[in-house]
Regions:
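Catalytic center-proximal scaffold of phosphoryl-transfer enzymes
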Residues: 1-246
Length: 246
């Protein structure tokens, strides 16, 4: 059943992906939980499939996606680079870039440059909100982005390049600037495809029950149970009765 869900998902041309920690009892005599990962792959507003892996390396997405070719949106974690078929396009998430500058503001609420960058990135989201409120098609939304948001994004890039020469690299602002510039090619691709969201939040949101669950069930009982957890989580989203189909 899980394989059928995976095959159905991979028919999509645009997916979002994310991963989160899942503590696992290994029963190896050490007593400490192993830090495994639950990976999520989904269509924005549609199906989502989970995959359990003991590690956070590239092996997980390589195995799940195979030679899939489409648009993959992530937070930029490097394990997603160099996977899939030769035509796979990796796009970034503007919300993650914005979050780095929000963190800089938390460190220094008087940091005018960080505040300015948050405001500029908020303006990008307002363009998409306007498109949603007017129930625009993906193509109409893309045209609106080109008319307004694309030039604002270029201003963000230019400002980041200026800041990179002036801020301490290890400061919160320096790290936010470095993340944005390192991700720039992927962030910029959000303006190349009509169907792509500016944010990977839909993928992150599907992981929230897992994060909350960690506080309740503490850990997965064994490595063999990990794939079952992934399957049950996916079935719940698909509204599949796990007990009936067991």
């Amino acid at each position: 059943m899980v394989e059928a869900m995976r095959q159905d998902l991979l028919r999509a041309s645009y997916l979002q992906a994310d991963e989160t920690i899942v503590p696992v009892q290994m029963h190896d005599g050490r007593g400490a939980d192993h830090q495994a990962y639950l990976w999520q792959y989904g269509k924005p507003g549609g199906e989502t499939v989970f995959d359990f892996q003991l590690g956070r390396g590239r092996e997980g997405p390589i195995k799940f996606l195979g030679q899939w070719e489409g648009i993959l949106q992530t937070d930029g974690y490097q394990a997603y680079d160099g996977i899939g078929g030769p035509k796979l396009v990796h796009v970034g998430c503007w919300t993650h870039a914005r979050r780095k500058f929000v963190d800089a503001v938390k460190v220094n609420p008087q940091d005018g440059e960080a505040i300015k960058m948050v405001t500029r990135m908020d303006a990008l989201s307002l363009v998409d909100r306007h498109a949603r409120e007017r129930q625009m098609s993906d193509e109409e939304r893309l045209a609106l982005r080109h008319e307004h948001a694309e030039s604002w994004a270029e201003e963000i890039r230019s400002e980041c390049e200026t800041l990179s020469r002036a801020v301490l690299p290890k400061s919160a602002l320096g790290q936010a600037v470095a993340y944005t510039l390192n991700m720039w090619a992927k962030l910029r691709r959000c303006f190349d495809y009509a169907e792509v969201e500016l944010s990977n939040n839909l993928a992150e949101n599907s992981m929230r029950p897992v994060a909350l669950g960690r506080k309740n069930w503490l850990h997965v009982g064994s490595a063999k149970s990990g794939p079952k957890v992934a399957a049950i989580r996916g079935c719940r989203i698909f509204c599949v009765n796990v007990l009936r189909n067991n």
